[in-house]
């Protein structure tokens, strides 16, 4: 399964609450600043709360069944 085509991150742009659909539960979700610093990580969930983060562009890494997907997220 191509993870990039299977998952959808929404809403994007976001107010900080990130949801993932397309797979049951992802193994891990990691949010990185655009400079590569790990901001937050969650495991065995399809939701990540980034509402405490500043507005801007973030990279979201999703791990599921050995595959990894990286997506851009804009927080308003």
Report each predicted region and the residues it spans.
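C-terminal outer-membrane/trafficking sorting elements
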Residues: 1-76
